[in-house]
Amino acid sequence: MFLQFYLNENGERVYTLKKVDPSGQPTSSAHPARFSPDDKFSRHRVTIKKRFGLLLTQQPRPVL
């Protein structure tokens, strides 16, 4: 059994152990992908994120 989630009407995550949500749509895994030090494509992902300004260092500081 793995933790799954689906989005409700308000766009909030609802966590469940079921494979389908109440409307019959499949749920998504709530676990992140495994990290591998042998990842051949990490350089490409970082390049794409840098190009589109998605890196955390390119985001404005959060207001506390």
Curated annotation (Swiss-Prot):
GO terms for molecular function: snoRNA binding; telomerase RNA binding. GO terms for biological process: primitive hemopoiesis; rRNA processing; rRNA pseudouridine synthesis; snRNA pseudouridine synthesis; telomere maintenance via telomerase. It is found in: Nucleus, Nucleolus. GO terms for cellular component: box H/ACA snoRNP complex; telomerase holoenzyme complex. InterPro entries: H/ACA_rnp_Nop10 (IPR007264), H/ACA_rnp_Nop10_sf (IPR036756). Keywords: Nucleus, Ribonucleoprotein, Ribosome biogenesis, rRNA processing. It comes from the Eukaryota. Residues 19-40 are annotated as: Disordered. Component of the small nucleolar ribonucleoprotein particle containing H/ACA-type snoRNAs (H/ACA snoRNPs). Component of the telomerase holoenzyme complex. Belongs to the NOP10 family. Required for ribosome biogenesis. Part of a complex which catalyzes pseudouridylation of rRNA. This involves the isomerization of uridine such that the ribose is subsequently attached to C5, instead of the normal N1. Pseudouridine ('psi') residues may serve to stabilize the conformation of rRNAs. This is H/ACA ribonucleoprotein complex subunit 3. It comes from Danio rerio. The gene is nop10.
